[in-house]
UniProtKB/Swiss-Prot annotation:
Keywords associated with the record: 4Fe-4S, Cell inner membrane, Cell membrane, Iron, Iron-sulfur, Membrane, Metal-binding, NAD, Quinone, Repeat, Translocase, Ubiquinone
Compartments, as annotated in UniProt: Cell inner membrane
GO molecular-function terms, A-Z: 4 iron, 4 sulfur cluster binding; iron ion binding; NADH:ubiquinone reductase (non-electrogenic) activity; quinone binding
Protein name in the entry: NADH-quinone oxidoreductase subunit I 1
GO biological process: aerobic respiration
Family listed: Belongs to the complex I 23 kDa subunit family.
Entry keyword Translocase: yes
């Protein structure tokens, strides 16, 4: 009876083949047809600007500290007004795992993730992006965000002298 079981196995295989031969193909012809990623898809990292056109990055090193694979490096410096900025900013995309922790850690929304997933190069050194490669002209996902307009500037006034700031509490005056 092995001939009958062999024939049954072949017939089952042919039936499955004929059943699937007229269905729509699941394969996407990638270079010609590009799939649209999900709305919250995280891929290429960019550095955004504030609404005035200046850099949002204040070189706080939080993104570098949050990165689990240590692919972000930078050097901080100050301009003439005392505002901190990154003299150079570098991301090694050959090491990046696109987890998004750097974008979550950034207090000024300078680092944002885009859905651009076509990052491939023949030379691995071309995957190391400098600040000039990462900076975009726009404000990113939240164009009205300008909360940290004065981030990185040292406080020159005494406590309680700023706008909408209350006088500090004298703890010794509260003691019995």
């Amino acid at each position: 009876m092995p001939i009958i079981t062999d024939f049954k196995a072949i017939a089952t295989g042919l039936f499955v083949t004929w059943k699937h031969i007229f269905r729509r193909s699941v394969t996407v012809e990638y270079p010609e047809v590009k799939r649209t990623p999900a709305p919250r898809y995280r891929a290429r990292i960019v550095l955004t600007r504030d609404p005035e056109g200046g850099e949002r990055c204040v070189a706080c090193y939080l993104c570098s500290a949050a990165c689990p694979v240590d692919c972000i490096s930078m050097e901080a410096t100050e301009d003439g007004n005392g505002r901190r900025y990154a003299r150079w900013f570098r991301i090694n995309f050959s090491r990046c795992i696109f987890c998004g922790l750097c974008a979550e850690a950034c207090p000024t929304l300078a680092i944002q993730m885009t859905p651009d997933y076509e990052i491939c190069e023949r030379d691995i050194m071309e995957l190391v992006y400098e600040k000039e490669d990462l900076l975009i002209d726009g404000c990113g996902k939240d164009p009205a965000y300008n909360f940290y307009r004065h981030a990185g500037i040292g406080v020159t006034q005494p406590r309680g002298a700023g706008e909408r700031e209350e006088e500090p509490v004298d703890a010794r005056g509260l003691m019995p």
